[in-house]
Amino acid sequence: MRIGIITLWQSNDNYGQQLQCWALQQALLKLGHEPYLIRYDIDGRINNTKKPLWKKILKVVLLYPLIKKLIRIKKDKVEKGLISYNATKNKERRFDEFRNVNIIQSDTVFKNLKELQDNPPQADAYIVGSDQVWAHLLSNYENRAMFLDFGDAKVKRIAYAPSFSMQLYPIGLRQELVDNLSRFNSLSVREKSGGNICKKHGFDVSVVVDPTMLLTKEDYNVLQSNEKHTKYLFLYYLNISNPEDIEWNELKRIAHKEGLKVIATPASGYFPGRELFDGVEYQYATINQWINLIESAEIVATTSFHGVVFCILHHTPFIYFPLSGKYSRGNNRVVDLCQDLSLSGQIWHPKASLEEMMNNDINWADVDLKLKNMRNESQNFLYNSLI
């Protein structure tokens, strides 16, 4: 069966985004299907089809008094400078090369929903997912693409592990949500909170694992690099703007005490990644190198869901630092996963001792057994959805 997948794919520094895309294709290939990525330009990066958010904000700010105008311009200048710096460093990560070599892609890049509707990608089934594809609200008509509002009605439509990244869908958009969910033949989500949203609106839904967990550690060997490092703590972070968001001074003290150097890799999520920490070795790793950095670390400190996932797959001890404020909605996926695998003790909280957490004795055999059961259920959902 030929299967078109629509998901997030354009990041040049978010490792989890690329690997969930690759992993779902691999899982479908194992089932004997012919998957490919539908290259939908949701970010408006190609030919500048969409005005960047910072420009829209700036346009509004220009209507305000001069002082607000100057503050906004300065902030935009800083952010644009950061984006420019990241673009230079991201060349070292070689994500374009990874996509071109490892991900089967549509020849066409669809720049908007109308192009998808006028010239729909040919497939026997469409899948949306995974990642936070349903965090893009239906108040923007273009986001109906992530609810598969294109193509022949006879084509099967499946949601595999999409994330809403919210607890409740906005009241004013709930009928829109019902209309768009009604399009699917099979529905699943990645988080329990997403399952509750669907059930509240009358839909049967399965909660399944992220595509990266459909595969085993051995499946990722084809992507491994074999670089060696002296003993180190790996710091993989995104969505933080202050070193103390991850208790940096204490973390640094413990690493020094244990004789561990610190290797750090920043990434972009809700906002651009940035270098925040002193006395660390920054590596803008390729995807293959990133997997190796997690597997070979003595311990990983991370704010990333996929950082946690790959620690679990490779039996690498980890500490997850929850996001705070308006970004705390991103914690649900990690909390759900760690609860399901009896790993909640690896989630930091203000009363926790980092030193004790770093020395927790994780029962990896128990984790593997629980993950195997979750994986089997998710594989069965995928298989049955495509019969």
Regions of interest found by a model, annotated:
Residues 1-387:
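Active-site anion-handling motifs in enzyme catalytic cores
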